[in-house]
Curated annotation (Swiss-Prot):
InterPro entries: G_ENGA (IPR031166), GTP-bd (IPR006073), GTPase_Der (IPR016484), KH_dom-like (IPR032859), KH_dom-like_a/b (IPR015946), P-loop_NTPase (IPR027417), Small_GTP-bd (IPR005225). GTP 2 binds at residues 226-233, 273-277, 338-341. GTPase that plays an essential role in the late steps of ribosome biogenesis. Residues 3-166, 220-393 form the EngA-type G domain. GO terms for biological process: ribosome biogenesis. Transmembrane segments: none annotated. GO terms for molecular function: GTP binding; ribosome binding. It comes from Haemophilus ducreyi (strain 35000HP / ATCC 700724). Belongs to the TRAFAC class TrmE-Era-EngA-EngB-Septin-like GTPase superfamily. EngA (Der) GTPase family. Keywords: GTP-binding, Nucleotide-binding, Repeat, Ribosome biogenesis. Residues 394-478 form the KH-like domain. This is GTPase Der.
Amino acid sequence: MTPVVALVGRPNVGKSTLFNRLTRTRDALVADFPGLTRDRKYGHANIAGHDFIVIDTGGIDGTEEGIEEKMAEQSLLAIEEADVVLFLVDARAGLLPADIGIAQYLRQREKTTVVVANKTDGIDADSHCGEFYQLGLGEVAKIAAAQGRGVTQLIEQVLSPLATALNSEQADENEENLATETNEFDEWNQDFDFNNEEDTALLDEALDEENSESIADKNIKIAIIGRPNVGKSTLTNRILGEERVVVYDMPGTTRDSIYIPMERDGQEYTIIDTAGVRKRGKINLAVEKFSVIKTLQAIQDANVVLLTIDAREGISDQDLSLLGFILNAGRSLVIVVNKWDGLSYDIKEQVKSELDRRLDFIDFARVHFISALHGSGVGNLFDSVKEAYACATQKTSTSMLTRILHMAADEHQPPLVNGRRVKLKYAHPGGYNPPIIVIHGNQVEKLSDAYKRYLSNYFRKSLKIIGSPIRIQFQEGNNPFAGKKNKLTPNQLRKRKRLMKFIKKTKNKK
């Protein structure tokens, strides 16, 4: 489960600055949702290899008279839903009564809390932060969020208790890598023929061992998400009611989301219901509970996401924010336009026109027009779900991807950089769900965004990938194991192949 980190504290202690630093706001989901306080923000972050959801709760005016009276209801909910609370204080302003009030509340909730003294730049941090130990919440982390100082160390401390051991192992590994890097580079440039199918088959076999875990589970997890009152509950119950094969309701690890196993045409599915606890029979719920946390975690845990939109309300900015999070998470996508029944022909054409205009950047996703209430079109969703999952997990080979790469380069040559043309050598699979294609070459980091989009679209069309995003990664040189834990050389690959042949022969003789 993706951990949740909540930022709490008085106004103007730097919560929003830290939030923007963690989420790199321009690239992350940052949105205000209905029912939340005005300055409450959610985002996805990846710091030091740790994926997590971060919440900015806005300013809390805690007083000695009672913190709960001054806290907004949604801020309380954020603290309850968080795995870790980062309690920000202002190192320059010192300890204030409001800080003490907030600390008292956090101690009562027995939440894992880290006191974070911000704005330590340009001052003697140790002398200014000493008084914050009075809060009784343990060690005080010292950062300067505006400059980014101490932020990475803070996240490692919070999310990786084994950070010291891991860093030690990484340091040893880096030392070893430095010693062998030159030899590996020479071997991959001289000893491996990327146009030889026997050589690339060896490579595929080794790479497949690293990527096989991501597609081992054949159970397709479907998350039904969307804004309040778009019909998520009705759609969930329509799917379950039609099939009548629900085994049991099993609470998932994601807070309050329900993981519901079901089977259809021999395929196992798990429906991730973010609309709250619901038993069969209770189909008509007046209001669907909406939790941003539940929705974001459901997206992370799903294989395929059904983004449900109300045809009568059209596409909102919140829909686009959720869509951005789905794409960032690399999840397969099916667009479901609900409440299609009863609309006039002219209104339907207007809705389709708006979809084409506002969703032109995800032309790879299937769009279904349904009525969850009456059931029309619901059964067809599973064809698109299976198609998207199959595309996201389809296996490809190095020889196939390299052929496609060379075809793309022949049709539209890479640009010149300082008088030299970027050379694209070969491509190999880098992972599944979503499909990852790793392209090796010289000066690939200098390729323009436009050419990268061209390559992505070319691979998508050539591989006929529908319903799933596709990720292209670029790597200098020839070594496909650069940066990986299990590094192999061409000779090691060939030795492994000979060993496997010997083992098979021995078994056959017995």
